């Protein structure tokens, strides 16, 4: 694994020094993100999205792309009246889009802040795993489970059974057919 990681840097440096185009085909998400200036994400022979690694990660055009790159929770909801009510919860998110009716909300776990004191959404920690540089948690919110990633140094602050409060930094709204409806930034 360490050799593979160091080779990423070496290949990228050679490409940059020579000023050449390199086509690199991989199923490894980390390699694709780390080594690419441009990514073409293909599913069944059809380009789903092309762009910089950051564009594709932060603004995935459909649920396939969002799910393929990184970790994400998809939650069904109902849009209307400037809000999205998440199914199986009491959670209502602000929504400025025009869509009404069925939607699916995509939330990346690193875009959730978890606290014991304050936040917009109340939940209960059901599991937590120490990963060294990160804590990987599952938090029950009503009838759904959200994944939350924290810095490793705060891992011991939260244990299963703890009541916690979550705040979302941003989320993505998809139409019920899986296509991008809107990306929303919260508290920015």
For each feature predicted by the language model, list its residue ranges.
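A generic "binding-loop/recognition-motif" signal
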Residues: 29, 52, 61, 71, ...
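C-terminal boundary and immediately downstream tail of ABC-type ATPase nucleotide-binding domains
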Residues: 58-80, 106, 167
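Non-catalytic connector elements of ABC transporters
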Residues: 72, 83-188
């Amino acid at each position: 694994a360490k050799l593979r990681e160091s080779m990423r840097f070496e290949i990228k440096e050679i490409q940059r020094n020579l000023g050449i185009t390199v086509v690199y085909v991989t199923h490894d998400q980390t390699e694709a993100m780390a080594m690419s200036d441009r990514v073409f994400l293909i599913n069944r022979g059809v380009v789903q999205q092309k762009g910089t690694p950051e564009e594709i990660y932060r603004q995935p055009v459909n649920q396939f792309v969002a799910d393929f790159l990184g970790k994400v929770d998809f939650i069904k909801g109902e849009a209307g009246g400037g809000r999205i009510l998440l199914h199986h919860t009491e959670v209502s998110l602000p929504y400025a889009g025009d869509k009404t009716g069925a939607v699916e909300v995509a939330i990346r776990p690193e875009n959730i802040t978890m606290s014991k004191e304050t936040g917009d959404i109340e939940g209960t920690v059901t599991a937590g795993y120490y990963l060294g540089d990160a804590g990987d948690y599952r938090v029950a919110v009503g009838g759904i489970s959200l994944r939350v990633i924290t810095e490793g140094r705060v891992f011991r602050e939260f244990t299963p059974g703890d009541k916690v409060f979550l705040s979302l930094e941003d989320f993505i709204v998809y139409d019920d057919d899986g296509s991008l409806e809107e990306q929303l930034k919260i508290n920015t």
